[in-house]
């Protein structure tokens, strides 16, 4: 049905199963680092089992935890996927406190708002350069 309607697969960049690694994506797919229903990438990394984090660092070629979030973004943008979606919380490198929704829970869901000053010119330029480099603009 997806293919008959011209819709591709959807891949989430959280996890280390081989099927979900960027080098295995089909062109006709959507890759994203997160949605409203899962943790931010930084929050995900903070809670990731050490062996999975070690694999992610090796796969992405970085040993520094601080750079890992942006390397995951880079992997998504540089993939062959037709569409890449990166939540602002990931560009801003925010932790779990910026999560939008935790399914099946009551309370603080849907409360996060981006501060109007959060996207400074330096970050905007970094986002634009990566998007341009990987032909996403």
Predicted regions and their residues:
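Polar, glycine-rich mid-to-C-terminal structural blocks
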Residues: 42, 47-59
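Conserved, mostly hydrophobic/aromatic
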Residues: 36, 110
């Amino acid at each position: 049905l997806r293919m008959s309607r011209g819709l591709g697969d959807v891949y989430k960049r959280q996890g280390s199963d081989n099927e979900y690694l960027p080098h295995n994506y089909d062109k006709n797919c959507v890759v994203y680092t997160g949605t409203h229903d899962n943790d931010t990438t930084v929050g995900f990394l903070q809670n990731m089992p050490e062996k999975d984090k070690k694999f992610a660092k090796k796969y992405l070629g970085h040993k520094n935890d601080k750079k890992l979030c942006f390397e995951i973004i880079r992997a998504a943008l540089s993939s062959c996927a037709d569409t890449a979606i990166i939540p602002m919380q990931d560009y801003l490198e925010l932790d779990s406190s910026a999560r939008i929704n935790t399914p099946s829970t009551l309370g603080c869901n849907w409360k996060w708002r981006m501060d109007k000053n959060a996207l400074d010119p330096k970050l905007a330029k970094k986002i634009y350069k990566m998007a341009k480099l990987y032909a996403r603009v």
